[in-house]
Amino acid sequence: MLNIENLDLHYGAAQALRSVSVSAEIGKVTCVIGRNGVGKTSLCRAITGQQKGSRGSITLDGKDIGALSPSDRARAGIGFVPQGREIFPLLTVEENLKTGFAPLKVGDRYIPDEIFDLFPVLNSMLGRRGGDLSGGQQQQLAIGRALVMRPRLLILDEPTEGIQPSIIKDIGRAIRHLASLGTMAIVLVEQYFDFARELADQFILMERGEVVMAGDHARMGEDDVRQRLAL
């Protein structure tokens, strides 16, 4: 379980996050929604250790990870699918997947068959360069790479951005399946409410670096959420 309490984050003098508190439970999808520039990606960077918070705490399965490096947080069980995918265009699909081996013990360094069950296209393109894949296929590759690490916490930052509708549905099915396994907590960062609504067990709505609404489907008024996202 991920637990964040009263997290502040600064880029120099600019404050990106203000007293953010978020929790994400194993077997559930926690969706962080909001318009561009409200701090969603900064929250991801704080969780993964790419940017250190200036106040507050971050714990994973009860252990404080605030002082850990990004690589140590990966070893602790955090898998991250960044906005823009960031696959290696000159490496093959198989080589890209194997970059997920880095935090694993030697005996665990193999690609689980489940990844190819979720995204069969990857199995048929193992020898192709990542840069030759479509945007949607690259997104599936980026998710697969994170899953190679067997994460306890999977963070997906804007996974539908620039993706064709058919693959968005595939990604949605994959997220739903992963949550149903009950082995990881999933944080889905998204600005499109319709996609988030289909998957989320709970919502976190952000504005100007702050959490302004939080709750499950019953507590989050759809009209109010849509109005805030449209502002």
Question: Residue ranges of each PLM-predicted region?
Answer:
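Helix-to-loop junction immediately C-terminal to a conserved catalytic motif
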Residues: 48
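Catalytic Walker B motif of ABC-type/P-loop ATPase nucleotide-binding domains
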Residues: 154-158
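Conserved ABC transporter NBD signature motif
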Residues: 56-63, 76, 108-111, 215
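The feature captures the beta-strand-to-loop junction immediately N-terminal to the Walker
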Residues: 33-35
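Conserved ABC ATPase signature
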Residues: 129-133
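Helical segment within the ABC ATPase nucleotide-binding domain
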Residues: 169-183
